[in-house]
C-alpha cells in the first residue's frame, strides 16, 4: 500500500471515530469497554505486517484498507529495514485522533510527535516485516525505510494506526493491520560521454537518468521532494553546467528552469556540488507523467562539463550522482550548504570515470647526435587515426566538420620540441577507456597519430603519420606514454651538387684563373720565340 493510501486509511479511521463520537466521552477521557467492539480496547493484542513489494505499472493503483489482500500483486523485495516509531498520541481518546487529523496527512509534522519507542525489522525473502504483539501496542506509528538495497528507491514514510476501522465491518476495529509499500528499483544511473573529448580541455557530457516513483496522481498524490545531486570534480567549472532536464519515455517533455526546476551549485571542501531540484510544478509534471506512463518514464538530467583550456586531467576524472526521491527525514541534504561531506546524498550511482594520460615525445635522428638540442624546433600535431597495413588514415574527432583537423589538447594544436629534444602533450584520453567503460578488445581505430609539420634544421619531415596508443593502466598511475620519433637527415644524408650563388662564383673564379693561366703560358711562349731570333 502506498503511503498516501495508508494516510487515507488513517483519515478513514479518524473519520469513523469522529462519526462515532457518541461513543466517546466529550471530555476526551477514555471510553469504557464496549462489549460490541466499537470502542478501542487499549489492552488488545496488535500486529503490523509490512508487505514489501516492487513497484510495477499495474500495482499500487487500488487504495489500501489495512486488511490483508491475498490478491495483491506483490513481487517481494528483501533486505529492506523498516523502523517503526510510536507517536505520542492516545488513540483511546477523541483528542488523540484529532491531533492526528489536524496534521492533514503531513508525515513530516507527524515526526514531531515521535516517542523513544522504536522497533526495527528487515524483510526476508518473502518481503515481509512482521511486527508482533510483543513489539507493538495500541497507538499511531511512523513507519520508515531506514535501509534499502542498492539501486532501490525507498518508499515514502507513512503513518499507520493500530487499530484501524475495519472496512468490512465498520462497527469494529482491525488490530492486525497489513500495509503494502512499494519500491521502485534501479533508481538512478549515470553515464559519461567523453569520446568527443580525446584531448583535455574539451567538454565532457554527463547524463543522469532517474526513476520516478509512482503515486496516485488522480487521487491527488504528488511527489513531495525530488532532487538529483551531482558531486563534481573541482576541475569542472560549476558555473557553466547548462543543464538540460527532461522527462523521457512514452511522451518526452523538456522541463523549464525556474518553472520546473532550479539549479543550485555550491562549493565543498574536496568537491563542488550541483543539485537539480524539482519545483512544485516540476514534481506535478513528473507525478503525472509517471502515472500515465510506465517504468521507462524517467527523469533525465544532462550536464555539460566545461574545463579551463590548460586543465590538468592526468589520471582519473571521477563523477558520481545521487537521487533524493522523496521527503524522508533520512535525506538531510542541504544543497546550499554541503559543508565538508564527500558522501553522496540519497541513492548513489556507480562512479563514472574518464582516464587521461600524458604523452612525452622524444625527438632524435638516425645520426644519434650527442647534442640533443639539435633536435629542437620539430613541430607536431595530433590526430585520431585508423591504423592500416601501410600506415594510418587520419580522422576528425568532430564529425560536424568537413575537414580533418588536429586535436586541441590543453588549448594547443601544435607541440614543439625543446630542451633536450622533447615535448609533453598534456593530456589524451586513454584509447582503451571510452565513455566510462574499459575496452577489452582494441581495434585499428583505437589510435592517435603524430604528424610532423616542421622538421629540425637539417632533417627530413616524417613521411607518414606515426600511430600510438595511450592506455588506461598507465593513465591511472600517471605514468607517461613515451613516443620516440627518429628523423633522417635531409636527402638521407647524401650531399647534392653545389648550386646557387656560391657555386657560380666558384666556377667564375676557376674560369678566370684558367684564362689568366693561359695568358701567362702564351706570353712565356712568345718571349722564348723572340729570344731565339
Swiss-Prot record:
Example of a GO cellular component annotation carried by this entry: pilus
InterPro entries according to UniProt: Fim_isopep_form_D2_dom, FM1-like, GramPos_pilinD1_N, Ig-like_fold, LPXTG_anchor, SpaA_PFL_dom_1, TAT_signal
LPXTG sorting signal, short sequence motif: residues: 496-500
Alphabetized Pfam families for the sequence: Gram_pos_anchor (PF00746), GramPos_pilinD1 (PF16555), SpaA (PF17802)
Signal peptide positions on this chain: 1-30
Gene3D superfamilies referenced in this protein's UniProt entry, alphabetically: 2.60.40.740, Immunoglobulins (2.60.40.10)
Alphabetized UniProt keyword annotations: Cell wall, Fimbrium, Peptidoglycan-anchor, Secreted, Signal
GO biological process: carbohydrate metabolic process
Its membrane topology: Peptidoglycan-anchor
Disulfide bonds: none
Propeptide: 500-533
Modification Pentaglycyl murein peptidoglycan amidated threonine occurs at: 499
Cellular location(s): Secreted, Cell wall; Fimbrium
Subcellular location, principal: secreted
Ranges in coiled-coil conformation: none
NCBIfam families, per database record: iso_D2_wall_anc, LPXTG_anchor, RrgB_K2N_iso_D2
Protein purpose: Major fimbrial subunit of A.viscosus.
Protein known as: Fimbrial subunit type 1
UniProt organism field: Actinomyces viscosus
Amino acid at each position: 500500500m502506498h503511503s498516501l493510501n495508508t494516510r487515507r486509511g488513517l483519515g478513514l479511521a479518524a473519520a469513523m471515530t469522529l462519526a462515532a463520537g457518541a461513543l466517546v466521552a466529550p471530555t476526551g477521557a477514555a471510553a469504557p469497554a464496549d462489549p460490541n467492539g466499537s470502542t478501542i480496547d487499549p489492552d488488545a493484542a496488535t500486529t503490523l505486517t509490512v508487505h514489501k513489494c516492487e513497484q510495477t505499472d499495474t500495482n499500487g493503483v487500488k487504495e489500501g484498507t489495512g486488511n490483508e489482500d491475498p490478491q495483491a500483486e506483490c513481487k517481494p523485495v528483501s533486505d529492506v529495514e523498516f523502523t517503526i516509531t510510536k507517536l505520542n498520541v492516545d488513540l483511546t481518546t477523541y483528542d488523540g485522533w484529532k491531533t492526528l487529523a489536524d496534521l492533514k496527512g503531513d508525515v513530516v509534522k507527524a515526526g514531531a510527535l515521535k516517542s523513544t519507542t522504536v522497533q526495527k525489522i528487515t524483510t526476508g525473502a518473502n518481503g515481509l516485516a512482521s511486527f508482533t504483539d510483543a513489539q507493538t501496542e495500541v497507538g499511531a506509528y511512523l513507519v520508515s525505510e531506514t535501509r534499502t538495497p542498492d539501486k532501490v528507491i525507498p518508499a515514502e514514510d507513512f503513518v499507520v494506526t493500530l487499530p484501524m476501522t475495519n472496512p468490512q465491518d465498520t462497527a469494529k476495529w482491525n488490530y492486525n493491520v497489513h500495509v503494502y509499500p512499494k519500491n521502485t528499483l534501479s533508481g538512478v544511473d549515470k553515464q559519461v560521454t567523453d569520446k568527443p573529448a580525446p584531448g583535455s580541455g574539451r567538454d565532457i557530457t554527463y547524463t543522469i537518468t532517474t526513476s520516478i516513483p509512482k503515486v496516485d496522481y488522480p487521487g491527488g498524490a504528488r511527489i513531495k521532494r525530488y532532487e538529483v545531486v551531482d558531486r563534481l570534480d573541482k576541475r569542472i567549472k560549476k558555473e557553466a553546467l547548462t543543464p538540460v532536464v527532461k522527462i523521457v519515455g512514452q511522451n518526452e517533455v523538456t522541463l523549464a528552469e525556474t518553472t520546473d526546476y532550479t539549479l543550485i551549485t555550491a562549493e565543498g571542501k574536496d568537491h563542488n556540488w550541483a543539485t537539480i531540484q524539482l519545483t512544485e510544478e516540476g514534481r506535478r509534471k513528473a507525478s503525472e507523467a509517471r502515472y500515465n506512463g510506465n517504468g521507462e518514464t524517467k527523469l533525465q538530467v544532462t550536464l555539460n562539463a566545461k574545463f579551463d583550456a590548460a586543465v590538468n586531467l592526468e589520471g582519473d576524472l571521477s563523477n558520481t550522482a545521487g537521487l533524493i526521491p522523496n521527503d524522508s527525514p533520512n535525506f538531510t541534504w542541504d544543497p546550499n550548504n554541503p559543508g565538508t561531506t564527500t558522501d553522496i546524498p540519497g541513492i548513489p550511482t556507480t562512479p563514472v570515470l574518464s582516464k587521461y594520460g600524458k604523452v612525452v615525445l622524444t625527438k632524435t635522428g638516425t645520426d644519434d647526435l650527442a647534442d640533443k638540442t639539435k633536435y629542437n624546433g620539430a613541430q607536431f600535431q595530433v590526430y585520431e587515426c585508423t591504423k592500416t597495413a601501410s600506415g594510418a588514415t587520419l580522422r576528425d574527432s568532430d564529425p560536424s566538420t568537413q575537414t580533418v583537423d588536429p586535436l586541441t589538447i590543453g588549448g594547443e594544436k601544435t607541440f614543439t620540441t625543446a630542451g633536450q629534444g622533447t615535448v609533453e602533450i598534456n593530456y589524451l584520453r586513454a584509447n582503451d577507456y571510452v565513455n566510462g567503460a574499459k575496452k577489452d578488445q582494441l581495434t585499428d581505430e583505437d589510435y592517435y597519430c603524430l604528424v610532423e609539420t616542421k622538421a629540425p634544421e637539417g632533417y627530413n619531415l616524417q613521411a607518414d603519420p606515426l600511430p600510438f596508443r595511450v592506455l588506461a593502466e598507465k593513465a591511472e598511475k600517471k605514468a607517461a606514454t613515451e613516443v620516440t620519433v627518429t628523423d633522417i637527415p635531409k636527402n638521407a644524408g647524401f650531399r647534392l651538387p653545389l648550386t646557387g650563388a656560391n657555386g657560380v662564383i666558384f666556377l667564375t673564379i676557376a674560369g678566370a684563373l684558367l684564362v689568366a693561366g693561359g695568358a701567362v703560358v702564351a706570353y712565356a711562349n712568345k718571349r722564348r720565340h723572340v729570344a731565339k731570333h
